[in-house]
Curated annotation (Swiss-Prot):
It comes from the Bacteria. Keywords: Riboflavin biosynthesis, Transferase. It catalyses: (2S)-2-hydroxy-3-oxobutyl phosphate + 5-amino-6-(D-ribitylamino)uracil = 6,7-dimethyl-8-(1-D-ribityl)lumazine + phosphate + 2 H2O + H(+). (2S)-2-hydroxy-3-oxobutyl phosphate binds at A86, T87, R128. This is 6,7-dimethyl-8-ribityllumazine synthase. GO terms for biological process: riboflavin biosynthetic process. Pfam families: DMRL_synthase (PF00885). GO terms for molecular function: 6,7-dimethyl-8-ribityllumazine synthase activity. Catalyzes the formation of 6,7-dimethyl-8-ribityllumazine by condensation of 5-amino-6-(D-ribitylamino)uracil with 3,4-dihydroxy-2-butanone 4-phosphate. This is the penultimate step in the biosynthesis of riboflavin. The lineage of its organism: Bacteria, Pseudomonadati, Campylobacterota, Epsilonproteobacteria, Campylobacterales. Its EC number is 2.5.1.78.
Length: 156
């Protein structure tokens, strides 16, 4: 059986965007740094990494649609943080952001990762933004790198 699998490698010419929902920026700034660091550690040329800022997680799918429709990017890494509050707002925002990211990624057939945190507390978000549980922004970028290699391996 032939196994087709992406590996963690960049050639250095891949153009990747990170879309950051700025709401909860104390958390999302760390996610962006994690993504940037992972991109550089795996051979990415920082001149080929763009940061697109949007107000919050709900706006990420719109920016993702614009980024992918431009034809400028090989892949897009989405990061943000939605923290549960006392109202159902969390449920609506997290569901729509997740659905929107998946829908747009499939529409354009390009690698897209969802590094949007959905946590019950700010402490959980901090832990996932580089404290105790690693950095989910870095993990989202590593996912993009592997999927981009798989995408290329499968012949686009």
């Amino acid at each position: 059986m032939k196994v087709i699998e992406g590996v963690l490698r960049l050639k250095g010419n891949e153009k990747i965007a990170v879309i950051n929902g700025r709401f909860n920026h104390i958390i999302t700034d760390r996610l962006v740094e994690g993504a940037r660091d992972a991109f550089k550690r795996h051979g990415g040329n920082e001149d080929n990494l763009d940061l697109i800022l949007v107000p919050g997680a709900f706006e990420i799918p719109f920016a993702l649609e614009k980024a992918l429709s431009s034809g400028k990017y090989d892949a897009v890494c989405c990061v943000g943080a939605v923290i549960r509050g006392a109202t159902p707002h969390f449920d609506y925002i997290s569901a729509e952001a997740t659905k929107g990211i998946a829908t747009v990624g499939l529409k354009y057939g390009k690698p897209v990762s969802n590094g949007v945190l959905t946590t019950d507390t700010i402490e959980q978000a901090i832990e996932r933004a580089g404290s105790k549980v690693g950095n989910k922004g870095a993990e989202a970028m590593v996912t993009i790198i592997e999927m981009l290699d798989l995408y290329n391996e499968m012949g686009k």
